[in-house]
Amino acid sequence: AKNLLAYRHNQLPKAIENARKLGFKDGAALFPQVTNNGEECHSEWEITFEEIHRNNIIVYAIVQHAVLTGNMDYIAQYGLEVMIAVSRFWSQRVSFSQPKQKYVILGVTGPDEYENNVDNNWYTNYSCIQCLKMTLRFLEMIAQQYPDEYARIRRITNLDQVKESARWRDIIEHMYLPEDKERGIFIQN
C-alpha cells in the first residue's frame, strides 16, 4: 500500500500539470484515470474529465494507510502535499449555485460509470466534503506534531492556510447533497 501511495506522490507534478492544462491553478491536482507516466492516457472524455471522484479516493487511501499503520510520518513527509493539491482542485472545481445557496459540482460521472455528465453526483459531492475535512484535520495535526515538516509543506505548496482553510470550510458547510426528503434518502444525482 505504501508503494502505491509513494507512486501517487511521485506523480503529483504531472497531476498538477494535468489540472493546469484544464485551467486549474495554484497547485491544484487532477490525478489521471489511466497512466504509465503521469499523463492521462484514457481516450474517453467522459471518464477522463468527468470521473473526478478518483482524486478523493487517493486522499482516503493516504489517511487510511496512516491510521491503520499508525505511520503519521508518511502524511507529514508525503501525504499532506497530495491532500493539499487535491483540496485545491475541489476548491476551484465547485461552483456556487445562487438558487440553491449551496456549492455544486456540475458535469461529472459517478463511480458506477452508468450516467455521464450529470450534476451533483452524491458520491462525488460527499467525497469532496470528506477530502476537505481530512486535509483540514491533518493540516492541524501536522502543524502541532511535526512543525518542521509543516513549515516545509507550507513553503513548497505556497499554502495560505488562513485563506484556503476558510474556503474549504465554507465548501464543507455549504455543499449540496441531493436527497429525496419525503422518502428520507439520498439520491444519486
Task: Enumerate the predicted regions with their spans.
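Acidic, mature catalytic/reactive cores of soluble proteins
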Residues: 1-189
